[in-house]
Amino acid sequence: MAGHSKWKNIQRRKNAQDAKRGKLFMKLAKEIYVAAKNGGGDPAANPSLRLVIEKAKAANMPGENIERAIKKATGNQEHTNYEEIRYEGYGPGGVAVMVVCLTDNKNRTAANVRSAFSKNGGNLGETGCVSYLFERKGLLVIDREQHNMEEDELLLLAIEAGAEEMETTDESFEIYTTPESFETVKEQLEQQGLTFASAEITMIPQTYTTLSGDELKKMLKLIDTLEDDDDVQEVYHNLDESVIEEQ
C-alpha cells in the first residue's frame, strides 16, 4: 500500500465522472434504491444506506434525487430486483481487475463485461482469481489545500479516532480504517472540523502492476469501457496510479 497514492486515481475517476454526471447519478440512485429496499429508508437504522448517501453527497448529487430513490424503494409501486454480481479477471499485462455490478439482467451484464475484457486485451477469470490481491478498507482522503495541518498533528487525531494508518502525499492525507470502524473514525474526525475530498469503503490493492505503451492504453480503455456500462458500479484494479496520472 505504501507509496501508492489513491488520491490521483480518485481524482481521475472523479474527473471522468464529472464528464458523465448524469450516468453517475443514475448509478448512485440505483445503489441508494437497493440499500433502502434491502434495509429500509431510514439512514440512521440502515448503515448501508447511510454510506451510499455520503457517497452521493460527495459526488454533489442533489438531495431531491437521493430522496426520490429512497421513496421509490420504500413505496408501494412495483420494485425492480437488482442483483449484485462480481466479476474478476485480468487486463493487459496481467493487471488484476474486479468489477462490481448491480443488474436486473445477468445475461446482459455478463455479455457486456466479457466483451469489454476481450476487446481490450484482457480475459475474465474464475471467482476468487484476483480478489486475494485486494483488501477491503475504509479510505478517508483529506485535500491538503483545504486544511492547514501538520502531518504529525493529523496522524495523532487519526490514531486516536481509531484509524489503522495514514499516508501523506504532496496533495493529500490518506487515512485507512477497517470497514467496521470507518463510520466512527469519520465522525470523530468531522467533530475536529475536518472535511473529506473522498470518503468510502473500497478495495485496496496489495500489489501493483506497471504498464506502458499499447498495454497501458488498452488497460485505460478497458477501465473506461467498464465504467461506462450502466450495470457496473465499481471497477477496482491494481494498475499503478502513477502511470494513470500521466495520461
UniProtKB/Swiss-Prot annotation:
One of its GO terms (molecular function) is DNA binding. Keywords: Cytoplasm, DNA-binding, Transcription, Transcription regulation. Residues 1-21 are annotated as: Disordered. One of its GO terms (cellular component) is cytosol. SUPFAM superfamilies: YebC-like. GO terms for biological process: regulation of DNA-templated transcription. The keyword DNA-binding applies. The keyword Chloroplast does not apply. It comes from the Bacteria. It holds the Pfam family Transcrip_reg. It is found in: Cytoplasm. PANTHER family: TRANSCRIPTIONAL REGULATORY PROTEIN YEBC-RELATED (PTHR12532:SF6), TRANSLATIONAL ACTIVATOR OF CYTOCHROME C OXIDASE 1 (PTHR12532). Belongs to the TACO1 family. This is Probable transcriptional regulatory protein GTNG_2524. It comes from Geobacillus thermodenitrificans (strain NG80-2).
